[in-house]
Amino acid sequence: MGNRLCCGGTWSCPSTFQKKSKTGSHPRPTLSILKQQQLWQNGTKDYETTAPTYEQVLYPPASQKKTSNSTSEESDLHYADIHVLRQIRPHSLHTVKCLHSESATEYATLRFPQATPQYDSNNGTLV
């Protein structure tokens, strides 16, 4: 997907399927930095552009490169204990009764009138 939101006119969009070259310890240039350098060379101001610029990283960060040493990956894991604290407010007797009645299970008994079966002598069935 990527950040290819603004392409058209004089804007050039790099292909997302291009093979990215690996770099050593050089800082990763971004599109906004390259665009600023291009604007500076052309003598135009940044606010004169017609569309907003979105920062897109041209090279993958070093942390995304896979290493064969799995123990170093495990040593980079950090776990955090998260505690959610909620202050309990005291309830009045009326509030407790209302809350209990709202969450209480209601039961009902349904009584249907008993049908008296009648025999139909023509068909030989109960009606």
Swiss-Prot record:
Organism: Mus musculus (Mouse)
Record bears the keyword Metal-binding: no
Region listing for Disordered, in residue ranges: 51-75
A Pfam family reported for this protein in Swiss-Prot or TrEMBL: DUF4578
Alphabetical keyword list: Phosphoprotein
Lineage: Eukaryota, Metazoa, Chordata, Craniata, Vertebrata
Modified residues (Phosphoserine): 63
Protein name: Uncharacterized protein C11orf52 homolog
InterPro entries reported in the protein's UniProt record: DUF4578 (IPR028106)
Phosphothreonine: residues carrying this PTM: 30
TM region(s), chain numbering: none
